Amino acid sequence: MKLLKLTGFIFFLFFLTESLTLPTQPRDIENFNSTQKFIEDNIEYITIIAFAQYVQEATFEEMEKLVKDMVEYKDRCMADKTLPECSKLPNNVLQEKICAMEGLPQKHNFSHCCSKVDAQRRLCFFYNKKSDVGFLPPFPTLDPEEKCQAYESNRESLLNHFLYEVARRNPFVFAPTLLTVAVHFEEVAKSCCEEQNKVNCLQTRAIPVTQYLKAFSSYQKHVCGALLKFGTKVVHFIYIAILSQKFPKIEFKELISLVEDVSSNYDGCCEGDVVQCIRDTSKVMNHICSKQDSISSKIKECCEKKIPERGQCIINSNKDDRPKDLSLREGKFTDSENVCQERDADPDTFFAKFTFEYSRRHPDLSIPELLRIVQIYKDLLRNCCNTENPPGCYRYAEDKFNETTEKSLKMVQQECKHFQNLGKDGLKYHYLIRLTKIAPQLSTEELVSLGEKMVTAFTTCCTLSEEFACVDNLADLVFGELCGVNENRTINPAVDHCCKTNFAFRRPCFESLKADKTYVPPPFSQDLFTFHADMCQSQNEELQRKTDRFLVNLVKLKHELTDEELQSLFTNFANVVDKCCKAESPEVCFNEESPKIGN
């Protein structure tokens, strides 16, 4: 298998799909051919990702059998493209071969998907994915010396194992992202294995790779969840806002062309159609670079790079400069006498234009806030256009926009103040209690992960000049992850209402939630309050995870207690751990002190 070189197959966070059509222009043909060659050269990696995401429980050995089968299929089709099997969509071929593996569908409980065909089967495989991967064993780790020996002796096997383990734990992450992570992983391994201090090098250089994966995972799940719960129109408006901020000089007609190119058929990437996702990501990149003069002045150098590098370059490029002739506000949406008539003539285009004009004038606002303003404007016109004097009614729209922005800003300022007062750990415990109270039905691991991500939003953003947009964007991703990708996911009535009622106002909805009154706590178990000397032998990170899990389980068990009472019990726990780990006999100390924690 050839060395992966897909670092640039990303555009912002836009791994989106569109219908596959044969290229007609020379530039399109060149782009299609280079993308096709990449897919052919990396069929093994692509198969690993698809199989590991569709059948997360499958063993590495089972995956190897499918890889061998897919490579043979590719070789047959390259030798004779007229074979009947070569006219099928790659994702259909892959799923057919997965279903044909003897005993596999029954062993891993997906035989019901194999009884379906085409779109129904693809959707079934998608719904079979599990975001909570607690059923998988811990991520296998190697001693740095062993890892380097494995890399030097069998690089291909190490990379295959790595991609398999990462893909099965991230079933909704798009293929280009996972391939890019594999590129970065190999770069880290190759560089650090030549260093004398391999441990420090691997630990330090692995952090940005992990952060990259987490960030893209959250975003992609968020947008796929929006697509499945709210439909294409919401995704369309998300990208109008994003692209208008990034490229404020773009013409509206060109923007809509790009947005449609980007968001028209998002299904492929969200479903896990790996080949289609890669093809269409490349097409989006080509679209941008073929129209760069009318899109942005910041991407010229990026577009001169080859396909593997240009995407990453565009991601890292700054927002384009605001056009000098762009007024601070666009009056035609609030001052014109004909607003209602223009809205009625073509509502979708009218509100798309409003989103475009408002977003490119407000690069300081978050995407959720821009969508809230669009919703407020829609609601305002729905009311005003039914009055005797519509212009006199919607003339004050800007006041409404400023009012909601001020409200959102105060929420962020209050949360950042909490962070400053409580510190990182204190804020995390605050959110672990809060999230567990509103969604106690979630698994302990999922709640711990959500709490960590919420705290990351504040530690990342609360010291930045663009604090508001940063916090609001990242916190919205956390709630998107809580809601999940699957449209059929249910947690409890209050949470489900926030997840499914209004995408733009999802976060304010969550902020207003109280403890779930429908929840029935599990029976009391003294095991929760029983600790042993191994607590003292845990490394810092492991001890922190145990502490976080204890707090979540404590809230689940004593759901009726106030935050202050829960904090008091948690303080008792922390004091016992501190006391016993300093004792001459930690085990004896834990046996004596543990029962007192829950009292």
Curated annotation (Swiss-Prot):
Residue stretches making up the Albumin domain: 22-210, 211-403, 404-599
GO molecular function: vitamin E binding
Entry keyword set: Disulfide bond, Glycoprotein, Protein transport, Repeat, Secreted, Signal, Transport
Signal peptide segment: 1-21
Glycosylation sites: 33, 109, 383, 402, 488
Pfam families: Serum_albumin
Tissue specificity statement from the Swiss-Prot or TrEMBL entry: High level detected in plasma but also in extravascular fluids such as follicular and cerebrospinal fluids (at protein level).
Domain of life: Eukaryota
GO CC aspect terms: blood microparticle; cytoplasm; extracellular exosome; extracellular region; extracellular space
Family listed: Belongs to the ALB/AFP/VDB family.
Protein name: Afamin
Organism taxonomic ancestry: Eukaryota, Metazoa, Chordata, Craniata, Vertebrata
